[in-house]
Amino acid sequence: MQLDQSNKAGTEPSEVVSRYLEAIYYMWYEKEPLRSARLADWLGVSRPTVAVGLRRMTRDGLVRMNGRKEIELTAKGMRTAESIVRRHRIMERWLTDGLGLDWVTADAEAARLEHAVSEVVEQRLYEVLGRPETCPHGNPIPGHSEASAKEVRLSTLGAGNRASITRVSEVAEREAPLLLAYLHKRDLTPGRRIRVLEADDVGKTLRVQVADREVTLSHETASKVWAVPVAKS
């Protein structure tokens, strides 16, 4: 099966536009409010800079502002963003599965390499890697798979609940790369089953068991981990 390359009708976007589209796509996917101030925080640039960038992207037919002053990707913008994200996630899989890099390093290197990779190399890597469905931390590769409709944030689970981790939010990956290393080191990775031992609504913490260890997470951290609840045995 060939990955969808239908967005390649025009020229490749610049690295700056790619960064904007990637960030907007991640926030949209995580159902975060898509406002320019939030985008500026994500990208680490000033609000006036984002305003200029969004005006250019609107002119180029990539984004639009809705009635709530939120950013929306147009059909063209979505196709372009999906292409960028797809290439990034395939590169991450190659860097982790093929070269043995850790999550954080792989993400940083993929961001550097993705702009220099052709469609031919991208497709070949995808095939060589066995047509992976997700990035190393579980986020679906656009055009090939989708997140489970049953998944919930770990922070919403109560004591006694069991779940299978599906993915770590891209928001965590981009805004708190050390969080990726923290979760990886504690085996809170896709495919792992966990049991909630304690949900402290006052202290805003979640104590979970994963394999033979116990891990305490803040609600903020737990909200960046997605999982599918499983029936109690």
Predicted regions located by residue number:
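Extreme N-terminal segment that seeds HTH/winged-HTH DNA-binding domains in transcriptional regulators
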Residues: M1-G44
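Basic, amphipathic "hinge/linker" alpha-helix immediately C-terminal to the N-terminal HTH DNA-binding motif
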Residues: K69-H88
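Short, hydrophobic-biased segments on the C-terminal half of alpha helices
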Residues: L54-R55
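Key DNA-contact positions within bacterial/archaeal DNA-binding proteins
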Residues: P48, V104
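A short, conserved structural fragment
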Residues: T58-N66
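Mid-protein regulatory/catalytic core that forms ligand/cofactor-binding pockets
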Residues: H115-S223
